[in-house]
């Protein structure tokens, strides 16, 4: 943390979400916000209510927003207890915010979650069991669903133009290997995260850093899996105000890092024929 960064732990006397202090967290959850509204409190309330007996810690990295500089902090101070808040001096983006958050965590397992997800009862233990099992994946994620229960994604891929396509076929309760999954909700062992090098801040401010991360995992012999028996609601596009950022710089970074993208990935026509859904047909993430 630089000298200009700010850090504090919330202590609301009447919290909507409370996380008990622990000296030995099993899972450290990292959340990156940027002018985020009340959805982050709803997410934290659902998280606090569903982690059960698992010792956890929560770190929120609040990137400064030019128009809403105090919005997230005010909400967290009012409605939470036991949440560590880190406020960097400048906007680090998603990747940089995640990495700053990781540096303030102690758990053996890292959970990266968006502020606009909602967790159901019983979601965490099955994902941890996958990481504890034989031949575990490097990354495990739930199926993301819309509020009406429609499958939003059970893993994703990119076509050769770098357009994202979501697998919307219901996997049932199966654990399926995927090319990558949205980092809206991931679990990964800290040792693996450190080994792979974490998220690349070159994808500032956001988008494609989860693709790059998962592709590095795959290049090094690891894999990403989605647990079909775990469904998490993702209020797509509600975590950050304003328009999504331009993707020109991030696309250039991805294509420079993975020049084989244009020749090895499937065509849009192939994915459409196989029943995948293009991100161009969906609201912003």
Language-model-detected regions and their locations in the chain:
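Short, structured coil/turn linkers that connect adjacent secondary-structure elements
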Residues: 63, 98, 114-115
